[in-house]
């Protein structure tokens, strides 16, 4: 699978099928600090991403 980290524009490739929570753990990211997007949809921590899919991981930015 192809993972694009934004806003860094860094790309990471992983082989096989992985649960989103496991992907975030492997990348050292905390679930509450990022959004995982497949196509036009948000993907939750419990969902799987297949080897032939691409996802984006975007930092969550909040302001007050």
Regions found by a protein language model. Give the residues of each.
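Ubiquitin-like/PB1-type beta-grasp interaction modules and other compact soluble beta-rich domains
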Residues: 1-63
């Amino acid at each position: 699978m192809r993972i694009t980290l934004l806003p860094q524009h860094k790309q990471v490739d992983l082989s096989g099928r992985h649960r989103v929570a496991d992907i975030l753990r492997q990348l050292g990211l905390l679930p509450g600090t990022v959004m995982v997007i497949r196509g036009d949809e948000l993907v939750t921590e419990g969902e799987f991403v297949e080897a032939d899919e691409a996802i984006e991981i975007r930092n969550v930015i909040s302001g007050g």
